[in-house]
A protein has these predicted regions:
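Acidic di-acidic motifs
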Residues: 9-10, 54, 101
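Two-component/phosphorelay signaling modules centered on CheY-like receiver
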Residues: 12-30
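Conserved phosphotransfer microenvironments
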Residues: 49-76
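The C-terminal output helix
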Residues: 113-134
Length: 134
């Protein structure tokens, strides 16, 4: 498993496509479609994930989510990639990229790979050495 991605998108078709593509690339994916679900999931996961965020969810603009992340104590500093069909301006330091709809899935995956860290894997034993006894 590479890392964890939270996808906040209110279009069910696009959500499912992103789920499939990210699962195929070995990411753990959490799908949400509202501001409340997005914030709840991020609070539960902490800053150990990447948020792929629709700029305008059905229940409000992404700016409210970005402000809520900054207001958390301590602030939730997860990287955010915005999805938008129009130009987006934001002052949030969390926003690391914007993907303009429609976007190529390969481009989206490249952006996710750039900002979603892989979990640390334990080092493999040196060749020819026996595993340590417990």
């Amino acid at each position: 498993m590479r890392g964890t991605v939270v996808v906040a998108e209110d279009d069910p078709g696009l959500r499912e496509v992103l789920l499939h593509v990210l699962h195929e690339a070995s990411y753990q994916v959490h799908l949400v479609s509202s501001q409340a679900d997005t914030l709840g999931t991020l609070r539960r996961l902490g800053a150990r994930c990447l948020l792929v965020l629709e700029a305008r969810l059905a229940d409000g603009a992404s700016e409210a989510i970005l402000q809520a992340l900054a207001a958390e104590q301590p602030p939730l500093e997860c990287p955010v990639v915005l999805l938008s069909s129009s130009a987006v301006e934001t002052r949030s330091a969390n926003v690391v990229g914007v993907l303009r709809k429609p976007f190529e899935l390969t481009r989206m995956l490249a952006v996710v790979k750039a900002f979603c860290p892989s979990p640390a894997l334990p080092p493999s034993p040196a060749r020819g050495s026996a595993p340590a006894a417990a």
